[in-house]
UniProtKB/Swiss-Prot annotation:
Reported function: The heterodimer acts as both an ATP-dependent DNA helicase and an ATP-dependent, dual-direction single-stranded exonuclease. Recognizes the chi site generating a DNA molecule suitable for the initiation of homologous recombination. The AddA nuclease domain is required for chi fragment generation; this subunit has the helicase and 3' -> 5' nuclease activities.
Protein name per Swiss-Prot or TrEMBL: ATP-dependent helicase/nuclease subunit A
Species this protein is from: Limosilactobacillus reuteri (strain DSM 20016)
Enzyme Commission code(s) on record: 3.1.-.-, 5.6.2.4
Catalytic activity from the UniProt record: Couples ATP hydrolysis with the unwinding of duplex DNA by translocating in the 3'-5' direction; ATP + H2O = ADP + phosphate + H(+)
Length: 1392
């Protein structure tokens, strides 16, 4: 692939100025390249990188952005063809890059707070609550305190005010008050995402304030209920119109008339809500037709003259009517306003005149047919008048509750196609009717007096709820301040406070103005995932006249609603900017990531599924992915493989299974099917294209990623893949604590804390750590049945020693002896572990368990051992981070973990590298921003979350809170407000579900596979039932499927099925398997307008037998390959083997006498002179030990710090260690480094008990200061962010590279571990620094310098090698800083 060549749209995004710009960047459209290149162009135009703000979504994205900008600047600097002034300016910008604000919003807020904390009276010494569980525990502790106070001070019921006790009763169950606890914390989280949390909380009761006037004038009705019902009715009208068209096209005129009456009913209901405008009424007037005037009397009938007079007047009225309608339509076409009062007067006049004619006909006793004609005329006028009359709630409610739907007659006979159409129309009509009934039940159950009464009581509850939540929030904020901790949302609120100066603070206001002037350009990446508070912060840094905002995102990829991300911020600007209002919208639609099979398949799905109603944005031409990854075409062998849709039907051939097994069987079978397909890809060496070398390569396991919606399936997935011997790495394991190895460790930790816990104890005894059998466990219990199991174990030990065992006949004497030995060994370990738990850290305890039980190594040898070891390492790491928090000790750690489990918080295991040759599994959310050659979207039949409808209280940031109300008699009333909030939540969730599907599909580069599973005995999960739902796609001939089938979909697969059902490749015959036969709809031939011609997909259903056969064939192929290779072996292989065994000599004898682990400190001593004064002795005996034993380790252990004497004269090692600590901790971003500054830092470290005062007095302060006056030190001060201190590393080296005496043939690998004092990343490469306290004799300066350099050369060479491996860029300088001389001594070449 060549260098970056922007498309026209990318060029606009890079070069347009003078407007706020919103870039809608579809997946794979090169938005990062746009951001980087825009930054470079702005710099070329004279802006400075340190006067820009570039906000990213993650720290990794910020680092990536900074690195790319640096690389782009370096490229300009290194290009000698560029003018010198340009290169100099770019070089200057590289120097400024470290100080540039390229960070997450939280990092930027933290920087603001650290700089301006004094404005808001905040103590700058705080710790961030980065651990979610620690934050949760702290919240629960504070809420417990608050709720206890509220319980103690609970008041009696006061009229017009709810008490705390009523709040608890209303929102808690009969078992506990967890419901209220959860609601308070949920309200806190949502409020915290608002610019003014307390204001948001105070407004919560407003939805239940129906005012003193008409209910129809209330805010709730006008702003929530009315728009919601109007939207629903319009959806029904749209669906009915499509059904009318289908009925008419197939000659079903009677059915069409009935469905048309349904549509007219919806129009009438719409008009009752005030949803009909004057313009709508004019259009309906134009559609009205006067019927014939019947019932003419005979010529000799005396009533004939009256009839003729009425007929003449009616004809005149008809003519006047037509003229009036024409006039109003003309005004509409000319876009002239039509006054409602004017139209109302006209219609009233016509209605009165028709009423007069009707009265005259009745009084004259004209024929009934004549009277009927005039009644219809008058009724038509009255209905039009009613459309313009203000309704009441009760009349509306009655209209909805009493709506009648006609019976659909006219069923065709002897016409199969017409019968099928008629049947589908009836089914669709029934579905719409069901949706309408649900609408009525949810919103039109109460008359106005009932509605008001329930709302009043609910409002009282919400006032109390709001007050309690505000109380909790204030207490929690104060607790955090008292403990000097802040959470991420606090950073945002305090930053917002800094940027919002009071009116009476002119200096503060000037500071904010200066900040606004400082940032010449504000660029926001992933703008679609911004919340309202973050938006407010960023808007405070600009002003309308500056027009310096550049926002990049893709609302189709907004998938963080659960974190309070608000995609409507993006949508609002996008719609306004596209209309030329306030800014410029630019669309990046080219996809440089995926092959045409992925882009085409994605388009054919979303052009049928996504619009503003479902997805919140139209999938129009701009939104379509445009294939632009033309580099795939560089290799002619690179064939486009269609997207695969693989369906697994769990019991298509086995309907006898019990219900309880269905879900497990369904998922397990799907996972085996996936494993089969992966094995086919890998073992059949299916090819993919590698853009790096332009060649085709066989698919490897590491090329494949499985994307999932939920982590809950991971344990089952790992189990099935282990059986198939497919290597698997799972990212973010759900139910981490359910993994066997983790459960065993947690059980062991629990009994170390308290062994008198039966279940954990038995779990450990049964585990491989002890290895008791069920029979042995039972034998122990029989020794004493009346005590806990630990006491029974003690009884067994005592009885064995006293030879008084009970029920001894159950085991042989050998078995009893073996049991005693295992139990004795375990109890010995338990004693040691319990002692460690009391005296040492938790980390030490866990590592001791791994070491002394060998459990870490054991699980590594199990199937899936790689992942199991990662799980145990994660527990160790979690314990380490736990000990950095405010919680301490084993008991608290166990409580900590139990809380994590209660709240479904996982450790989020960081497994091995993604590039390892294993199949990787991650959530769709975890994959965002990544791309993979082969993507499986698995478990696509997993049901959507629709739990909101079951909650007593539901919360939405925009719609507010909706609750059920329980009266004094404990009767529960639902409220229309709650149903309105549920509707808003579900609408948002379905829109986000659709966007999550989009993200999943667009991760794929070359292959895309979608899988799902079904169960025929469960109606909602059966393939047959799903197939019927997918057939609803035929209800519309339009490309966009009707709203109802899309809204009522239950899973990703439902959406995929709806879109693909319109293609012949997705047919009943293709998908039927075993005893499940799907019926092809006769509507399948329906022509859909705009449907893509080449869908690029295949679909197939598998049964358990199909998967077994497929796996067997793969095994046969593998066996055949092995047999073929074996046949090429020489016939005398057996003789050769025997001779090899007899003559064998182990080639690494020397290595058996050498340790496989060496520290750099120890290796360094092999190179250095042994006469260093006051250092740890490396004496003759030790060197002899090296020669004879090959052990390169220091046997002199340091004296533990807690028993060191503080009065002795410090030795060089102590001073050296303390000096290194000062170098490590010294702040480098303060500018000037002088002796006073260094001394302050040393005293600070003494105060923190990190340095002994006696040792501190001997630290060479002048030597430290002098380092930062050297050329290297000055570079470090200019770029402190690029200087890395005390960096640990481990690497593996060959033995012959380290030690003499190890022959080349004895090339054993040795693990080297060390800590690098410091290194600086520069444009040219790395500068490696090592500090030394060595004494030099000034009379022999040159001699001593040469000696010191020779001593440490080997050590620095090892560091250099490690840095080359770690950083991937060369070490261009390395040297020793000698504190005694105050000089930086460079190593230039070997032997200098």
């Amino acid at each position: 692939m060549a260098g970056f060549k922007p498309t026209p749209a990318q060029s606009k995004a890079i070069n347009d100025r003078g407007e706020n710009i919103l870039v809608s960047a579809s997946a794979g459209s090169g938005k990062t390249a746009v951001l980087v290149n825009r930054t470079i162009e702005l710099i070329k135009e004279g802006q400075s990188i340190d006067r820009m703000l570039l906000v990213t979504f993650t720290d990794a994205a910020a680092k990536n952005m900074r690195d790319k900008i640096r690389a782009a600047l370096q490229k300009i600097v290194q290009d000698s063809a560029n003018p010198k002034d340009l290169r100099d300016r770019m070089s200057n910008q590289i120097n400024r890059l470290a100080a540039a604000d390229i960070s997450t919003i939280h990092a930027f807020c933290l920087k603001l707070i650290k700089r301006y904390y004094y404005l808001i009276d905040l103590d700058p010494q705080f710790r961030l609550l980065t651990d979610e569980t620690e934050r949760l525990l702290l919240q629960e502790d504070v809420w417990h305190e608050v709720s206890e106070e509220l319980y103690r001070n609970a008041e009696e019921k006061v009229s017009g005010k709810a008490s705390f006790s009523e709040l608890v009763l209303n929102f808690s169950s009969d078992r506990d008050d967890q419901g209220l606890d959860d609601l308070i914390l949920r309200l806190y989280e949502i409020a915290n995402a608002q610019p003014d949390p307390e204001k948001w909380l105070q407004k919560l009761p407003d939805n239940y304030d129906l005012g003193s006037g008409s209910l129809l004038e209330s805010n709730f009705y006008q702003q929530q209920l009315k728009p919601l019902v109007i939207e629903k009715l319009n959806q029904f009208i749209q669906d009915y119109r499509e059904l009318v068209t289908r009925a008419s096209d197939n000659g079903l005129d009677q059915a069409a008339e009935v469905i048309k009456s349904d549509e007219e009913l919806m129009h009438q209901l719409l008009s009752s809500l005030g949803g009909i405008t004057v313009s709508d009424v004019c259009q309906m007037m134009a559609q009205q037709k006067f019927g014939s005037f019947r019932g003419r009397p005979a010529a000799d009938d005396p009533r004939i003259d009256v009839f003729k007079d009425i007929q003449k007047q009616r004809n005149q009225l008809k003519k006047q009517w037509e003229q009036m309608v024409s006039t109003y339509l003309g005004k509409q076409e000319a876009q002239e306003p039509i006054a409602k009062e004017e139209l109302l007067t006209e219609l009233t006049t016509f209605s009165d005149q028709f009423t007069d004619l009707l009265s005259k006909a009745t009084e004259s006793q004209l024929d009934a047919k004549t009277v009927d004609s005039l009644q219809k005329d008058q009724q038509m006028m009255q209905e039009l008048l009613d459309l313009l009359q203000p309704p009441t709630w009760n009349t509306i409610r009655d209209l909805f509750a009493n709506a009648k739907f006609a019976r659909m007659g006219g069923k065709p006979k002897d016409d199969e196609l017409a019968e099928e159409v008629y049947k589908s129309l009836g089914s669709a009509r029934t579905g719409i009717k069901k949706q309408f009934d649900q609408l009525v039940d949810r919103f039109f159950n109460y008359r106005e007096d009932q509605f008001r009464l329930i709302s009043t009581h609910a409002q009282e509850l919400l006032r109390e709820l709001s007050a309690v939540t505000i109380n909790f929030r204030r207490r929690y904020q104060q607790t955090k301040l008292n403990r000097h901790v802040l959470e991420f949302s606090d950073l945002e609120h305090y930053a917002y406070a800094i940027l919002t100066p009071p009116d009476d603070q002119p200096n503060w206001q000037t500071l904010v103005k200066d900040l606004q002037n400082h940032y010449q350009e504000i660029m926001i990446d992933e703008y679609q995932d911004t919340n309202r508070l973050q938006e407010s912060i960023l808007m405070k840094l600009t002003s309308p006249e500056r027009k310096n905002l550049f926002m990049v995102g893709d609302v189709k990829q907004s998938i963080y609603r659960f974190r309070e991300a608000d995609p409507t911020l993006f949508l609002g600007k996008y719609q306004n900017y596209r209309q030329g209002s306030d800014g410029e919208a630019i669309v990046l639609g080219e996809n440089f990531r995926s092959m045409t099979n992925v882009t085409s398949f994605t388009n054919i799905l979303f052009e049928q599924l996504m619009d503003r109603e479902v997805g919140e944005i139209d999938y129009d031409e701009d939104a379509h992915l445009k294939y632009a990854a033309t580099y795939y075409e560089e290799n002619q062998d690179n064939k486009v493989h269609p997207t695969e849709v693989l369906l697994y039907d769990a019991n298509a051939l086995d309907p006898e299974k019990e219900d309880v097994e269905h879900e497990d069987d369904k998922l397990a079978g799907e996972f085996r099917m996936i494993g089969m397909r992966i094995k086919q890809m890998v073992e059949n060496q299916e090819l993919i294209f590698h853009p790096e070398d332009g060649q085709m390569h066989p698919i490897q396991y590491g090329d494949i990623v499985l994307l999932e919606r939920t982590k809950a399936i991971n344990n089952s997935l790992m189990e099935e893949f282990n059986k198939l011997n497919i290597p698997l790495t799972v990212h973010d394991v759900e139910s981490y604590f359910q993994a066997t190895e983790v459960r065993v460790m947690m059980s062991l930790l629990k009994i170390i804390d308290n062994p008198q816990q039966d279940i954990p104890l038995v779990a450990v005894l049964r585990s491989p750590i002890v290895g008791l059998t069920n029979q042995e466990l039972a034998f122990i219990r029989l020794q004493n049945r009346s005590v806990d199991y630990y006491a029974a174990l003690q009884t067994f030990m005592s009885n064995y020693q006293r030879k008084a065992l009970r029920h001894q006949s159950l085991l042989t004497s050998e078995q009893v002896n073996a049991l005693y030995e295992k139990a004795d060994h375990f109890l010995g370990l338990l004693r040691v572990f319990r002692q460690t738990a009391q005296q040492q850290t938790l980390v030490d305890l866990i590592w001791q368990i791994y070491d002394q039980t060998g459990y870490l190594d054991y699980v590594g040898a199990m199937p899936g051992g790689h992942q199991r070891q990662a799980n145990l390492h994660a527990l160790y790491q979690r314990a380490h981070s736990y000990e950095q928090s405010s919680f301490k000790g084993l008991y608290q750690f166990i409580r900590f973990i139990e809380k994590m489990q209660e709240h479904d918080k996982d450790l989020g295991v960081a497994p091995t590298q993604l590039t390892a040759n294993t199949v990787n599994v991650m959530t769709i959310h975890g994959s965002k921003g990544l791309q993979f050659p082969v993507v499986f979207l698995i478990d696509a039949t997993h049901g959507f979350n629709k739990g909101a409808a079951r909650e007593n209280a539901v919360v939405d940031a925009v719609a507010g809170v909706g609750i059920r109300y329980m009266d004094d008699q404990r009767v529960i009333y639902d409220t229309p407000q709650r149903q309105a909030v549920i509707e808003e939540i579900q609408r948002g969730e379905r829109a986000e579900d659709l966007r999550v599907l989009y993200v999943a599909l667009t991760r794929a580069e070359q292959r895309l596979v979608i899988t799902g599973s079904f169960n025929e005995e469960m109606r909602t999960q059966s393939l047959a039932g799903s197939w019927q739902r997918w057939q609803k796609a035929y209800q519309s001939k339009n490309l966009l499927i009707g709203p109802q089938p899309r809204i009522t979909a239950n899973s990703f697969m439902d959406w995929v099925g709806l879109a693909l059902a319109r293609y012949p490749e997705f047919n009943a015959q293709q998908l039927s398997r075993g005893n499940v036969t799907l019926e092809e709809s006769t509507l399948a031939d329906t022509k859909v307008t705009g449907l893509a011609a080449d869908p690029h997909f295949t679909a197939k259903t598998y049964t358990a037998l199909d998967v077994s056969d497929g796996l067997a064939k793969i095994g046969q192929n593998a066996s055949a390959n092995v047999t073929e290779k074996n046949n090429t072996v020489a016939t005398d292989a057996s003789e050769q083997k025997i001779e090899q065994i007899l003559r064998y000599r182990y080639p690494h004898l020397v290595a058996t006498k050498t340790t496989a682990y060496q520290s750099v400190t120890d290796v360094k001593r092999v190179f250095e002179d042994p006469d260093t004064r006051d250092m740890a002795r490396w004496d003759y005996d030790q060197q002899q030990k090296v020669k004879t034993q090959g052990i390169y380790l220091n046997n002199n252990f340091d004296v533990p710090a807690f028993i060191q004497q503080t009065t002795h004269e410090p030795v060089a090692t102590e001073i050296g260690t303390a000096t290194h600590l000062v170098f490590q901790k010294l702040p480098l971003d303060e500018g000037l480094i002088n002796v006073e500054f260094v001394d302050q830092e040393i005293q600070k470290l003494v105060g923190e008990k990190l340095i002994n005062p006696v040792v501190a007095a001997r630290i060479n302060r002048e030597g430290i200061v002098a380092f930062y006056q050297t050329a290297v030190g000055q570079k470090i001060l200019k770029h402190p962010a690029d200087y890395h201190r005390e960096v640990p590393f481990s690497m593996i080296m060959n033995g012959h590279e380290l030690f003499k005496g190890v022959n080349v043939s004895d090339d054993e690998r040795i693990l080297i571990h060390g800590i690098i004092d410091g290194y600086l990343r520069t444009d040219e490469g790395i500068i490696l620094v090592d500090y030394k306290n060595d004494h030099l004799n000034k009379d022999y300066r040159d001699f001593d310098l040469a000696r010191i350099k020779d001593r440490y050369r080997g050590q620095l060479e090892l560091y250099k090698e490690a840095l080359n491996l770690m950083e991937g860029i060369p070490v261009v300088q390395m040297g020793l800083y000698l504190l005694e001389l105050g000089e930086f001594v460079l190593f230039t070449k070997e032997g200098d």
